[in-house]
Each structure stands twice: as structure tokens, then as C-alpha cells.
UniProtKB/Swiss-Prot annotation:
Belongs to the conotoxin O2 superfamily. Residues 20-45 form a propeptide. GO terms for cellular component: extracellular region. GO terms for molecular function: ion channel inhibitor activity; toxin activity. InterPro entries: Conotoxin. The presence of a 'disulfide through disulfide knot' structurally defines this protein as a knottin. The cysteine framework is VI/VII (C-C-CC-C-C). Keywords: Disulfide bond, Knottin, Neurotoxin, Secreted, Signal, Toxin. The keyword Acyltransferase does not apply. It comes from Conus litteratus. The keyword Electron transport does not apply. Residues 1-19 form the signal peptide. This is Conotoxin LeD51. Disulfide bonds join C51-C65, C58-C69, C64-C73. Expressed by the venom duct.
Length: 76
């Protein structure tokens, strides 16, 4: 009878530990999703912010990241 009681206690501890680990995993997944969404938003803005990258049509040098506009933004 004592062995059965000990076995049940060990099983209960293992199950509660597993439940805690699973909950922690869910929180980590949510944190990872938030982190990746922030990175995606930064990538959508472009490497240098709101300026245009190379070979993009422009009207003024201030539109280009390089500050060099000759109908298209130049890299340098």
C-alpha cells in the first residue's frame, strides 16, 4: 500500500511539472511571435527608414537614402 501511495505521489509531481513546462513554452512562443513581428515591421520600413533604396524613381535627392537622385536613386 505504501508503494502505491509513493507511486501516485511521484506521478502527480511529474504531471504538475509537465504542465508548468508546457505553460512556459506557450509564453515563449507568444514572445517569439511578438519579437518576429517587430522585426518584420522594421524590415517593411526599409533598411534606412522611410527613404528609397537604389534604382527607385525619385524627384528630389532627399527622397533617396544615398541623397543622390538622377531620375532614380543611386547607391552612392
Amino acid at each position: 500500500m505504501e508503494k502505491l501511495t509513493i507511486l501516485l505521489l511521484v506521478a502527480a509531481v511529474l504531471m504538475s511539472t509537465q504542465a508548468l513546462v508546457e505553460r512556459a513554452g506557450e509564453n515563449r512562443s507568444k514572445e517569439n511571435i511578438k519579437f518576429l513581428l517587430k522585426r518584420k515591421r522594421a524590415a517593411d520600413r526599409g533598411m534606412w527608414g522611410k527613404c528609397k533604396d537604389g534604382l527607385t524613381t525619385c524627384l528630389a535627392p532627399s527622397e533617396c537614402c544615398s541623397g543622390n537622385c538622377e531620375q532614380n536613386c543611386k547607391m552612392w
